[in-house]
Each structure stands twice: as C-alpha cells, then as structure tokens.
C-alpha cells in the first residue's frame, strides 16, 4: 500500500540518463564513454564531427561539437572532463539534429502518438528549448516507433513507468527518467495530451492496488 512512486527508486540509481543508451547499441550513434585523453582523441579522429557532453548535465549545458581536426580539441576535452578526471560521453555527430532533437514519451511501456521536436536556432547547435530551440509537435516515424518498442520492455522490467527518450534522426541519444519534459509544450500546441495519458495510467494503477 502507501504512495505510488513513479519510476522505481533503484532505477534512478541504475539508469544514468546518458549511459543507459549503451544497453541498446544497435539503435544508438557510435558512442564512447571515457575520461582518458588517448581514448577520446582516438574516437574523435575517426569521426568527421563528434559531440561531447558530461554524463550529469541537463538543458544542453557543456555540450560541444568538435571537428576532426579542431585545434581546440584538447582545450574542450580538458574543460568537459575537468582535466581528464571526469568521465564524459562522446558521440558521432548526427547531422539530422538540424531537423530537431525529438522528445518521445513512453508511459508504462507504450509510446505516445506524437513527439516534440526541438529545432535548434540558427545561432546554436543545441536542440534544447532553454537554448532557444523551437518546439514543434510531430507524428512518430516508423523508426521512432521501432526505437520505442526496442527499449520499452527494459523500461517496464526496471520499474520505469514514465520516460522521455531523445531521438536524433534514426538514433537514440538519451533516456530521461528524472526530468522527461515536453508534456506541457505538446499539451499547448496539440490536442493530444501526454499528461492526460500519464495520469490516466497512474489512476488505473492505483485502482488496481
């Protein structure tokens, strides 16, 4: 009995929102998680462009794009890794970010029918609303649904009732379980209501207890 906890507490510990995508390598971009300079520079050298970001960041903070021959590479890595003492994520750059960083909500193992694309501004590469990205509600593509259906059983198995995944192009980039934002924007710009689906599901679970 007692209160209903949305997303099991041990899932908050076990599912780092960036690292957890490594459970699904067939639907993610090429990715390296490391703090070692040699490993990071070796990975960057094999990509045309690389995105680097901290594992505990949010809102697009401290996310950088590094070109293969960028003379600022070491300086950027020093800053993001705190002089190679802090583990970060490096991913091959997905050019479809210009069409939007797609937030898709999954409620109790089922994806919602629309997503929120956060389209970067002309002056910033980051698809975050707080960084000036433009919100646009869109239907899910077949690939979006495939990604959702791939990860949904793992979410349910680990007690994650509500998640907001990030998809760029055809690739999963994050699984957000502490701050799966975007509901309010979808509710505002579209007749489809993610919040109604979530609370209907919560009510159903409570009634079954």
Segments (PLM) and residue ranges:
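Phosphate-binding site of ATP-dependent enzymes
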Residues: 37-38, 45-49, 56-145, 155
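Anionic group-transfer/hydrolysis microenvironments
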Residues: 9, 55, 93-94, 105, ...
């Amino acid at each position: 009995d007692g209160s209903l906890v949305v997303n099991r507490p041990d899932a908050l510990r076990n599912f780092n929102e960036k690292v957890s995508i490594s459970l699904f390598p067939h639907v993610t971009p090429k990715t390296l998680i490391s703090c070692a300079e040699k490993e990071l520079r070796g990975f960057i050298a094999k990509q045309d462009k690389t995105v680097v970001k901290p594992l505990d960041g949010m809102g697009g903070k401290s996310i950088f794009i590094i070109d293969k021959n960028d003379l600022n590479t070491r300086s950027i890595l020093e800053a993001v890794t705190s002089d190679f003492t802090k583990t970060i994520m490096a991913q091959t750059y997905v050019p479809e970010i210009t069409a939007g960083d797609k937030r898709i909500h999954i409620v109790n193992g089922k994806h919602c029918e629309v997503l929120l694309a956060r389209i970067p501004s002309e002056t910033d590469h980051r698809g975050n609303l707080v960084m000036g990205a433009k919100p646009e509600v869109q239907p899910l593509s077949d690939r979006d649904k495939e990604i959702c259906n791939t990860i949904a059983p793992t979410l349910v198995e680990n007690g994650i009732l509500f998640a907001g995944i990030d998809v760029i192009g055809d690739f999963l980039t994050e699984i957000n379980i502490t701050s799966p934002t975007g509901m309010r924007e979808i509710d505002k710009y579209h007749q489809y209501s993610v919040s109604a689906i979530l609370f209907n599901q919560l009510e159903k679970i409570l009634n079954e207890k």
